[in-house]
Regions:
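Extracytoplasmic/periplasmic solute-binding protein
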Residues: 49, 166-180, 185, 209-258, ...
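C-terminal capping/gating helix-and-loop segments adjacent to ligand/active sites or protein-protein/ligand interfaces
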Residues: 254, 343-344, 384-387, 392, ...
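Hinge/lid segment of periplasmic solute-binding proteins
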Residues: 48-50, 123-184, 209, 236, ...
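Extracytoplasmic "Venus flytrap"/periplasmic binding protein-like
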Residues: 80-160, 192, 196-200, 301-305
Length: 467
């Protein structure tokens, strides 16, 4: 469950300082003659050397969260960076528990120069750094051209991303967090099953439930989700609300603005979500399942849709599935045909701490990560796609067909991200409790759509009162 589980839990964890200990794989990737002789590395070396940059401090210390993408990309990109900048040494700490590992180091003043870690990580480290204004302003990096493309980096990144709370957490137009990849999220389905039955993916909520009635006749549920990890529902709820209430209103939601979900249109979305459970469209047993169980059931054609992202293909590579199963991804339903459909994106992130000892080399490393060579390497080693406009075409034929095809959802809907603004220091609200942790109650009929919506609005009121 690579990305979405803790998306809505970050706020709850942000105030928790975990001074956990652990061991990270630590290495210094030295440039080898073999790496330097490779065509890709030679190209990167030539590109980077054009600027003939030198640095007073040639040692770069980076900390990387090791998630579903693994470590191979990082091992190789470090070799290529060192080859491109002779004399530079990169020391890496990489671990699934990197937040717990580097938190005590940061407290002790041993701050990494560069971090690859998300603001929704369960340790709450990056969220805490945002609250404490402990991240460096990276706006100058994105105003500059890239290493291998003179276009300013800000114009190379997918539209709307740098302006979002994921990259500009204070809403002041300054970039403090850099985007890594932007994986599309939505409703995963089996393209083969739809083709065999002549079904079209639904556009409106009416279409969605009509399709559910057809599926019932074949003994297939319309919908399932990762029951005990309800945060996955974000890839359906937020785009649906954006379509119904307007994308600008989602900025108000993200900043906990009272009344931002009080409209009739917003309520209709909550009612449609609740209808999945109340009217028998939810796969039996869903609320008790974990992510792998529910995803496997969907892949066995027990349900038409499950909310997830394009990483599901890799995550479920060894899972059983229906014969001929082919991954597809479609947008959340809209209230009325003609409304803008949105594609929620799960964004992984890079940071440079405000008190990094070698910020200039860290910034150059960040620029190096956005080169075409790096983008293709990430696709090759991790089956991932950078958050750049041209990245999907750069990696065609490198990433799997499933990932490439699911990225085509951007042709169907408009890109959006959703990230909560920094919670006021004075607030004790756990926003996840009101938004997604009540999902099982809603689906079981123990909470109405109105109560669900009103509970979120009450949380917003409490947050506003604490400011």
């Amino acid at each position: 469950m690579k990305k979405a589980i803790s998306m809505m839990l970050a706020t709850a964890m942000a105030a928790t300082c975990l001074a956990g200990c652990g061991s990270a794989a630590s290495s210094s990737a030295a440039a080898s003659s073999e790496a330097a002789s490779s065509e890709a590395t030679s190209a990167a070396t030539s590109e980077a050397s054009t600027g003939e940059k030198t640095f007073e401090n040639n040692e770069l210390n980076i900390a990387v969260f090791e998630g579903g993408y693994g470590s191979e990309y990082w091992d190789e990109i470090i070799k290529r960076f060192e080859a491109a900048y002779p004399g530079v040494t990169v020391n890496i700490q990489i671990s699934p528990k990197i937040g717990d590992i580097i938190r005590p180091q940061i407290v002790a003043g041993n701050v990494p120069d560069f971090i690859s870690m998300n603001d929704n990580d369960s340790t709450g480290l990056i969220s805490s750094m945002v609250k404490e204004h402990a991240l460096m302003d990276l706006s100058d990096v994105f105003e500059e051209g890239g290493i291998d493309d003179d276009t300013p980096l800000k114009d190379q990144v997918i539209d709307g991303l740098l302006d979002s709370a994921k990259c500009s957490p204070y809403g002041d137009g300054k970039i403090y967090i850099a985007p890594f990849d932007a994986s599309p999220m939505g409703l995963v389905y089996n393209k083969t099953l739809f083709e065999e039955n002549g079904w079209e993916t639904p556009v409106t909520w009416d279409d969605f439930f009509e399709l559910g009635d057809k599926a019932k006749e074949k003994g297939i549920a319309l919908f399932t989700y990762q029951g005990i990890y309800p945060g996955y529902l974000e890839s359906m709820l937020w785009p649906a609300l954006a379509s119904a209430t307007g994308i600008d209103n989602m900025k108000a939601v993200a900043s906990y603005t009272p009344g931002s979900l009080s409209s009739d249109e917003a309520l209709k979305v909550f009612q449609n979500m609740a209808k999945i459970g109340s009217d028998g469209y939810l796969m039996d047993g869903t609320v008790a399942l974990n992510h792998t169980q529910s995803q496997t059931d969907m892949m066995m054609n027990k349900a038409l849709f499950i909310p997830n992202g394009n990483w599901m293909e890799g995550e479920m590579a060894d899972a059983p599935r229906a014969d001929g199963f082919e991954f597809g991804l479609t947008c959340a339903p809209v209230l009325d045909d003609g409304e803008t459909r949105y594609v929620m994106s799960s964004v992984e992130q890079f940071e440079i701490p405000a008190n990094a000892k070698n910020p200039e080399l860290a910034k150059e490393f960040l620029r190096f990560l956005y080169t075409e060579d790096s983008v293709k390497l990430f696709a090759e080693k991790a089956n991932g796609i950078y958050a750049l406009k041209k990245a999907n075409e750069m990696v065609k034929g490198i990433v799997t067909d499933g990932v490439y095809n699911m990225n085509d959802i951007y042709q169907e809907g408009t890109f959006m991200v959703f990230g909560w603004d920094a919670m006021p220091d004075t607030s004790k609200v756990v926003i996840a409790d009101s938004v997604f942790n009540v999902a099982s109650d809603v689906m079981n009929g123990d909470m109405t759509a109105e109560q669900w919506r009103d509970g979120i609005e009450a949380a917003f009121e409490e947050i506003a009162a604490s400011k």
